[in-house]
Amino acid sequence: MTLEHDRKGISIAVSAEVQAALDAGQPVVALESTVISHGLPYPHNLELALAMEQEVRDQGAVPATVGIVAGVPTVGMDAAAIRRFAHPDPHHPPLKVSRRDIGYVVAAGGDGATTVAATMALAHLAGVQVFATGGIGGVHRGARETWDVSADLTELERTPVLVVCAGAKAILDLPATLEYLETGGVPVLGWRTAEFPAFYSVSSGLPVAYAQDASFVARAWKAHRALGGAGMVLAVPPPVEDAIDRAVVEAAIERALNRAVKEGVHGPAVTPFLLAALARETEGESVRANVALLRQNARIAAQVATAIAGI
């Protein structure tokens, strides 16, 4: 059963479990659906989606997987919807949806897998404060020529959701991404680290503010919001046992970027192309690291959401 919230004639479905938790002031963690439909192949994508939800539950919080299901923005997708996104009709797969695409997919009555930006937007409408993902988008390498900057960054500037991630995706220009976030007034905290993680790698050499535990993150979030701030990033290094050496990742990225240029890949197709190329270059190590950090981020996000609920 879901509860329908009408917003100027547009319905937003919030699962009964999620709504009950929100009403009771209990911790809720949003999860994106792009990782289901545009991440791993079936059945690994389904296994990961369910594992992330279980990581959240194991910490005493309620998971809320976000997506657009048959034209209805949904916060707290049920098992049937998650399975449909994981193994869709090949003729009608879910569209990859950022904030700009939400209205289009709703009007078309289709399925939409939400990116970081769209997940933040819908989670906030439902009242969810914490969101776990793999990595945020950011400023792409070569953005001086292409102007390719992810909508995730502008969403963080305006939408009050705390995003728990492994930093920005490694294929991006990490220094420029941090500069953009600073300009937008978006705090970036490192989970038990003073260095910005580089997604697959533990560190990038770029400094961030140190956060020692969930209680501190919760207090920082409350203060940030009370003083008019919007989004916040909690950057969590990947598990050490699954991390990949930064030099190895950079070499693989350079080769992948050269291939992208030669093959004329551009726009929204760049990120999936590069991630697939990285998986080949690292013989699957990047995929294993991605799965490990996603599960870890879900777990830590639940701890943070619990700490926020306890203040």
UniProtKB/Swiss-Prot annotation:
Q: Which organism is it from?
A: Roseiflexus sp. (strain RS-1)
Q: How is the cofactor bound, as the UniProt entry phrases it?
A: Binds 1 Mn(2+) ion per subunit.
Q: Where is the active site?
A: E32 (proton donor), K169 (nucleophile)
One family from Pfam that matches here is Indigoidine_A
Give residues annotated as binding substrate: K96, V116, S150, A151, D152
Q: What does this protein do?
A: Catalyzes the reversible cleavage of pseudouridine 5'-phosphate (PsiMP) to ribose 5-phosphate and uracil. Functions biologically in the cleavage direction, as part of a pseudouridine degradation pathway.
Q: Output the Gene Ontology cellular-component terms.
A: cytoplasm
The EC class name is lyase
Q: Which EC number(s) does UniProt give?
A: 4.2.1.70
Q: What is this protein called?
A: Pseudouridine-5'-phosphate glycosidase
Keywords (A to Z) from UniProt: Glycosidase, Hydrolase, Lyase, Manganese, Metal-binding
A Gene Ontology MF term for this entry?
pseudouridylate synthase activity
Catalyses which reaction(s)? D-ribose 5-phosphate + uracil = psi-UMP + H2O
BP terms from Gene Ontology: nucleobase catabolic process
User: Which sites bind Mn(2+)?
Assistant: D148
This protein's cofactor list reads: Mn(2+)
Task: Report the family membership.
Answer: Belongs to the pseudouridine-5'-phosphate glycosidase family.
Record text on subunit structure and interactions: Homotrimer.
Q: Which gene encodes it?
A: psuG
